[in-house]
UniProtKB/Swiss-Prot annotation:
Reversible hydration of carbon dioxide. Its main location: plastid. The active site is at residue 204. It comes from Arabidopsis thaliana (Mouse-ear cress). Residues 1-22 form the signal peptide. The gene is ACA8. Zn(2+) binds at residues 232, 234, 251. This is Alpha carbonic anhydrase 8. Pfam families: Carb_anhydrase. Disulfide bonds join 163-324. Its cofactor is Zn(2+). Substrate binds at residues 320-321.
Amino acid sequence: MKISSLGWVLVLIFISITIVSSAPAPKPPKPKPAPAPTPPKPKPTPAPTPPKPKPKPAPTPPKPKPAPAPTPPKPKPAPAPTPPKPKPKPAPTPPNPKPTPAPTPPKPKPAPAPAPTPAPKPKPAPKPAPGGEVEDETEFSYETKGNKGPAKWGTLDAEWKMCGIGKMQSPIDLRDKNVVVSNKFGLLRSQYLPSNTTIKNRGHDIMLKFKGGNKGIGVTIRGTRYQLQQLHWHSPSEHTINGKRFALEEHLVHESKDKRYAVVAFLYNLGASDPFLFSLEKQLKKITDTHASEEHVGIIDPKKLSFESKHYYRYSGSLTAPPCSENVIWSVSKEIRTVSSKQVKLLRVAVHDASDSNARPLQAVNKRKVYLYKPKVKLMKKYCNISSY
């Protein structure tokens, strides 16, 4: 069998490898001649085995290291927002204290100036109308829910406190079951003289004023003489009888020398016109819607008022308008008169205030005695005399 040259080469390689592997171990230096067999390219065999796997660890360590690089920028944004916040806080604080002292000093200075404003309040008190009531009634009102209504009268002026705290106020409900019947007062009679008069719109009612007071004796009660000062009207009536209210109430206000008052009141139902009011219609129309205006009426004889009354109620009370003074003797006729609806309307239209009434609400009777005068048959006369009780 023939062996090719390649085969011989392989045989030589194998023999050389066998010789190298079979060489004794304790003689390491002798392998130096081994380089001679290396030319047959035994080295390529270690090439596949060379530890080139070592580069594998290289890719793992370097690439995780760049991760720490992004960490430094994180602290930068955090400090940035924190510094601007404290800066605006001090800015607003300094300007606030500065303006506050400026307005405070001027405000206490004007405070004493408005102090004199309460001074005008006493105006109604120093200038009462004849008969003790307020001359200008626009200082109060009859609106029950208003700030100047009857429930507030006592707080509107120091001189009007009795309107709120008085225990003998007027008007009241006159109940027959609670009265004391008496025939000791005497019949109702007046002694008036003709007098010059004017008619005036006071703001809530129409007043007929007797200039200088009527010079007649007027009426006498408990030995005291009272002269007629003025008369005025309320609609509906202020007093009631046994709970019934009437269309109109007329007040004849008398005054004594010591500033006490006697008021004689007449109540009206709707019906035939009243002759005395009829005689004043021309003047009433002239003062319509003209507050504080005063029209000359001329000479009037109060006897035309038809003063007679056989039965009347008597009690101690007050003025029914501010200042509500409790120094009034009331005589309220039990005999009802008549007035036309046109006349009642004329009295209200002439005033033309915000209310549809100028009647004060009823007041408590409290412990007062109310008398009903009923004369003996032999004493009944045409005129009545008001005497003491």
